[in-house]
C-alpha cells in the first residue's frame, strides 16, 4: 500500500490522464503515497491516504473523484485531516488557480476540513492556520472566469490575523473578527467588492 511514484508513471498506465491539466502539468512531480486507493480513473476513491511531495506538501485524508480524465469536469470530494502546503505549490498543482500575489504572504498553510467541487467551482469548509494568523472558512468560490472575476460567498472568521502584513499597510495590525460575505466579486485589490457583515472583536 506504500508507493513512491511520479505522475508520469501513473499516466503511462492511464494515457487518458494526459488530458487532465493537473497530471499533464505536474507529470514529473514525485509523490510518496501511503493508503488504500481503489476504482477506475473516472471513479477513484482513496481511504486513509497520506501523500507527501518533495517540497514538504503533505496531505492526510480521504477522497473520492469523478471524471479525472475529462478536462474541466474533474470533480473532487476531499475530507482532509491535514493539508500542509503553500500557495505557490497550489498554483503549480491546480489548473487555472492563480490568486493575487499577496496570498503568498500566508506562507506555510495548514488546513483541516473539506473541499467539495471542481477545481474552479467549489465549497471549502474548515480551519486554516497560516504564518499571518488563523481562519475558519465556510466559503463557496467560483473561479471559472479567473481571479479578477471570481465570485464567492460564505463565512470567514479571523483570529490573531496580521492584517497589516496581509495588506502591506502600517495602518492595520492584528485582528479578530467574524464575517459573512455576500456577493463577493474579484480577488484582486483594484476590482474586489463584496457585501460584508462583520463583527470585530
Q: Residues of each region from the PLM?
A:
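Short beta-strand/loop motifs in extracellular/secreted proteins, especially
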Residues: 152
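Outer-membrane beta-barrel translocator/channel fold
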Residues: 85-91, 164-167
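Structural signature of outer-membrane beta-barrel domains
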Residues: 54, 83-85, 131-133
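Flexible, solvent-exposed coil segments and beta strand-coil junctions
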Residues: 12-17, 28, 39-43, 90-95, ...
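Helix N-terminus capping/helix-initiation residues
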Residues: 6, 86, 162, 187-188
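Short intrinsically disordered, low-complexity coil segments enriched in acidic
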Residues: 1-18, 79, 89-91, 197-201
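Extended lipid/amphipathic-ligand handling interfaces
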Residues: 1-3, 21-23, 31-42, 48-51, ...
Amino acid at each position: 500500500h506504500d508507493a513512491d511514484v511520479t505522475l508520469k508513471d501513473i499516466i503511462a498506465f492511464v494515457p487518458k490522464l494526459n488530458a487532465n491539466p493537473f497530471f499533464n502539468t505536474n507529470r514529473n512531480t514525485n509523490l510518496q503515497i501511503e493508503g488504500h486507493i481503489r476504482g477506475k480513473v473516472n471513479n477513484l476513491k482513496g481511504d486513509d491516504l497520506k501523500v507527501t511531495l518533495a517540497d514538504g506538501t503533505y496531505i492526510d485524508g480521504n477522497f473520492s473523484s469523478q471524471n479525472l480524465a475529462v478536462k474541466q469536469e474533474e470533480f473532487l470530494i476531499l475530507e482532509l485531516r491535514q493539508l500542509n502546503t503553500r500557495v505557490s505549490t497550489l498554483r503549480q498543482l491546480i489548473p487555472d488557480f492563480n490568486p493575487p500575489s499577496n496570498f503568498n504572504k500566508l506562507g506555510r498553510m495548514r488546513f483541516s476540513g473539506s473541499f467539495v467541487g471542481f477545481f474552479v467551482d467549489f465549497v471549502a469548509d474548515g480551519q486554516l492556520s497560516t504564518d499571518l494568523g488563523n481562519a475558519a472558512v465556510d466559503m463557496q468560490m467560483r473561479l471559472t472566469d479567473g481571479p479578477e472575476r471570481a465570485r464567492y460567498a460564505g463565512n470567514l472568521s479571523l483570529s490573531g490575523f496580521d492584517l497589516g502584513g496581509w495588506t502591506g499597510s502600517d495602518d492595520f495590525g492584528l485582528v479578530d473578527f467574524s464575517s459573512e460575505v455576500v456577493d463577493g466579486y474579484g480577488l484582486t485589490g483594484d476590482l474586489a467588492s463584496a457585501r460584508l457583515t462583520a463583527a470585530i472583536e
